[in-house]
Amino acid sequence: MKILVIGDSCTDIFIYGGCQRMCPEAPIPVFEPSKTVTNDGMAGNVVRNLKALGVSDVDIITNREQITKTRYVEDKSNQMLLRVDSNDRVSNSFNPSKIDFESYDAVVVADYDKGFLTYKDIDLIGKKSKLSFIDTKKVVDHNYFEDFTFVKMNEVEWDRCVDKGANY
């Protein structure tokens, strides 16, 4: 099976450590890092998950600009203390004219609403793909999904769409 993943991606950095003392110049804890883990995130995470499921032929089309999400995590409890996002918006650099959609068994759209894909881009992907999946954070109505085979939404995104007046 050959799968194409299209969407926003980032670098996820997890800095694990602990807080054993308070800062002398402000009433905040001092974080002491002990380990750093770096992963591909968003659309990159979709690729990693597909490969973990045994899909070996996976291509990705994603943003050129680097988005970084750095999470500071207390290593004993695994509690996230802080997340720092860098370069959270990217340009719409997607060019569907160079994609042979027929050569893919399935297309996955991982749209995190960071700017890489427009509504028009996503609509075109749904129309041109044989088997298509979409996970979007955009506020949309039900007509937006009519060309997609599968739709994945979190409750927050669902509620935003319903609040917009979508008729489901």
Region locations from a protein language model:
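Ribokinase/PfkB-type carbohydrate-kinase core domain
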Residues: 1-20, 34-168
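Divalent-cation-assisted or electrostatically stabilized phosphate/pyrophosphate-binding catalytic cores
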Residues: 27-34
